[in-house]
Every structure is written in C-alpha cells, then in structure tokens.
C-alpha cells in the first residue's frame, strides 16, 4: 500500500529529471549551432593582444594575457564590471587556447560554459520548487516552463555576465529559503558567499539584498516573540554581513579608490546622439500601450528605435527572442515568433497574478512571501528606473532581470489549489513553441 501511495511522487520526480535533462541537451544543441556573437550585447571585438576594445571579449583576453585586473588610468568599456565571469572565461582560455590558434574557437568553448550555467539555473529553480513542497502537475509544468522557456536558450549563448549572476542569485535564494526554515550558521555562510560571488559577477546582483534583509528581520522578530532568544541570530547576521559586504563590494570599492568611479557606475551612452536614444518619447508611450509595430514584431528594427520604446512589451519581446536573433525564413515562422512573444506576455502575467495571490495568503510562510514579493518588486522597480535613467532601446531587456522569473515561478508554485487548465496550456504552449523555434530557426 505504501509503495502505491509513493508511486505518483516518484513518477513526478523522474518526469522532472527527464525534463531537466532534455532542456539541458536542447540548450547545448542550440549553443553548438549558433556563433558566440549571436547575442552581441556589449561584446566588442576580440583583442589583437595589443589593444583592447573594452567589450566583454577583450576583457576576458586582458585577464588571460596579463593576469591582473584592469590597470588603466580610468575605467572604460566593460572593465567597470566586477571580474568573476571574465576570470572564469580567462580560465577557459587557459585550457583551450594555443598560441597562434583560433581565438574564436575558444570563445565558442566559453559559450558552452555559459550555457551550462543556464542549465544550472533551471536545476536550482526546480530545487527551490522542491524546497517549497510544490508537487503534482504544477511542479512538472513549472519545471518544464523553466527548462524549455525561450530566455535561457539565448541567455546561455550570450557572452555576458548576466547568466552567471542569475545562477548565483538563484542559489542565494535557495539558501535563504533553507535558512528561513531552520536558521543555521552553515546555511547563512553559504548564502553570504553566494551573494558576494553574484556581486563579484555583476554589481546589480545586490538588488536581492533588500528581500534577504526582510527575511532576516522577520525571523529575528519571530524568534524574539516565540523564544525570547536573539544571540544566536545576531552572530549569524554578523557572519553574513562580514562575508558578503567586504567581498561583494571589493571590486567597486577598488575602482572608487583608484579611479573615483561612482559605486553605481554604468557605462554612459551617447546621449541624444545615440541611435538607440528614446528619452524624448512620452511617458505614455514608455509605460502605456506599445505601438502596433512593437506588438507584431519578432525583432527590433533599428531604423525605427522609437517604435520600441514601451518598457513592458520590450521586456516580453526580449524574453522570447532577445533583440530578434532567430533566423525566420517564412511567414509561418515569423507568425510563430510573434505568438511566442504574446505567450511570454500571457505566461508572465499569469505567474504574476498567482504570485500576488500567494503574497497576500496567510497560509504561506511569511518569510518566503517576503523573499519572493520584495525580491520581485525591488528588482523589477529598479529595472524600470534603470530604463528611464539610461533611455536606450537596449536597456529594456529581460537579461537584466531573469531572476524575477525564479521569483514568479516559485510564487505561483505556492499558489493554493491546482493550476487552472488554461494556465497549464499557456505554459506548456510557450515551452513547446519556444523549443520548436529555437531548434528550427537557430541558423
């Protein structure tokens, strides 16, 4: 009798593992097909070993060649970014580059490394769902949505620090969930190290810190109320701060000291002369309804950037297709790509509605609700502010905030009741359509 009761859970576990493996295999197949420059966000060109363009590619080569952090007289290009991703890229260079050999071939290997990080994001997302005791068809559907959804196909092939940052953020969130269940020094030290490493990958990883702080405060007050003891928690909080703050902030503090670089520095655009400039678009166009061209586009048409100034739809477009990287050869494929963008919008809104419901449900642990709700809110609000501070088309991209999808999937997983059929069909439709397009239209 006991084995028959356990069987459904075991079947779900096996099915989820198959989904994870299939998703990883498909991502690797996609990465093998496309060049490392398929998603060319701030890549720059490869270095000639004498001069450096300041893009992500030459940053990696600089670290490999000189084995030191940037020592120029000022910060420029991508060198203001913390170096962890680029250091790992330099290590891959050391493994695969031979003097006089193909630099491009080594960048392809780095692309594979980045794709493995994308696969790991899905695995950590599944583990978070398991920690939150999400079960049944809901667990399978959400796992499939993470595994086969479109964003991680292209994000894994983009040679930027966004994918690794998202992985380390997700791992931090997992540890905070475990700590909230049972506060232990070992768990909080892991969380501190992971957050610090995320910040050493990209400074904006710190945006999940307010949510972590809310969890700490809630558990602290709850412990005082229930047990009247606070000293063990104070030691744990001290350990978290002493590890995460000095290590995570070390690179930006170095640059502030050496180059007087602001702690929140971002490489500036060209102002109103930037061909992507959209700062003169109205507030309604930015935050209201998207243009018809944007609604029915499967890529950004750079000759008309102001048609793509709407933050919401630009986020959905890049979630599905980055800036339009698929090779769409006929009307059927173009129509399917537009439908994928629409399904990303519908899926995100459905997950958001479920997460909001979870946030206001007293049946879910308050610490988890704070982590997911505050985490999503702070990251997304910061993204909107960023899009206005730097009004360019390229600043509205899901790559900056993919961690919000982990918050939404976890939040929906905790939603009371079964997943409605319409939502399940929407998520599965998105997963299957994205997989078909990224398999058929990669090159």
Q: Where in this protein do the model-derived segments appear?
A:
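Transmembrane-helix signature of polytopic, membrane-embedded enzymes
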Residues: 101-107, 122-148, 166-167
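Specific aromatic-rich, kink-prone transmembrane helix
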Residues: 124-127, 164-181, 193-195, 407-411
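Extracytosolic helix-loop segments that constitute the early lumenal/periplasmic catalytic or substrate-binding loops
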Residues: 29-80, 84, 94-96
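Perimembrane helix-loop-helix junctions
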Residues: 175-181, 208-245
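Membrane-lumen/periplasm interface segments of specific transmembrane helices
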Residues: 235-350
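Start-transfer (signal-anchor) and selected internal transmembrane alpha helices
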Residues: 1-34, 220-221, 232-243, 356, ...
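Membrane-interface transmembrane helices that cradle and orient dolichyl/undecaprenyl
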Residues: 132-133, 172-190, 198, 220-223
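Short acidic/glycine- and proline-prone juxtamembrane loop motifs at membrane-interface regions
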Residues: 151-165
